[in-house]
């Protein structure tokens, strides 16, 4: 069971999870490739009460976090690079005004300079919006920016604690290949 704000959410359909305050960016991004950047962003507004009919304006914060999106509003999502698609997916999730943002491997397969942009954006999201972030990530330098860590093997938690206490032994035992 997954309970968020006292509400059982794991059996709810995605749109109800979004309306309950959870933003989700899946591994692999899952943007809509045949929609424009702007249309993909508008989908994020659907999570708000009243949906797109009531909320038509894209929050400027997403363009501050990911300036490339403003330049490519008319471009199809499928024409963006992988890193740009990831930025679009995170921005779309943010537009639903989540209380919790779930990011599943947001830097997987992304070129290093875009990884830095995404890391910087996530830091800003945490510090400026009050949104909680649950990050599934393999890049240890990014993980170390979190408050807590959980190491998993075969779907179970095998180690956890404050990230400041993430030891070399734990890294070698559970996080090394």
Residue ranges and their predicted role:
Residues 12, 37-57, 65-67, 161:
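ABC-type ATPase nucleotide-binding domains, specifically the catalytic core motifs of the NBD
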Residues 101-105:
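Catalytic Walker B motif of ABC-type/P-loop ATPase nucleotide-binding domains
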């Amino acid at each position: 069971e997954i309970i968020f704000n006292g509400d059982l959410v794991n059996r709810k359909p995605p749109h109800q999870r979004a309306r309950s305050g959870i933003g989700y960016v899946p591994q692999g991004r899952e943007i809509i490739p045949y929609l424009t950047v702007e249309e993909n962003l508008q989908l994020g507004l659907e999570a708000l009460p009243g949906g797109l009919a009531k909320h038509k304006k894209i929050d400027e914060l997403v363009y501050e976090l990911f300036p490339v999106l403003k330049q490519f509003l008319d471009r199809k999502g499928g024409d963006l690079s992988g890193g740009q698609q990831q930025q679009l997916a995170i921005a779309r999730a943010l537009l639903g005004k989540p209380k919790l943002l779930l990011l599943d491997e947001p830097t997987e397969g992304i070129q290093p300079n875009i990884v830095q942009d995404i890391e910087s954006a996530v830091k800003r999201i945490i510090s400026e919006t009050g949104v909680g972030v649950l990050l599934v990530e393999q890049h240890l330098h990014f993980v170390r920016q979190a408050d807590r860590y959980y190491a998993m093997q075969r779907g179970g938690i095998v180690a956890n604690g404050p990230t400041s206490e993430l030891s070399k032994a734990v890294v070698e035992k559970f996080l090394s290949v």
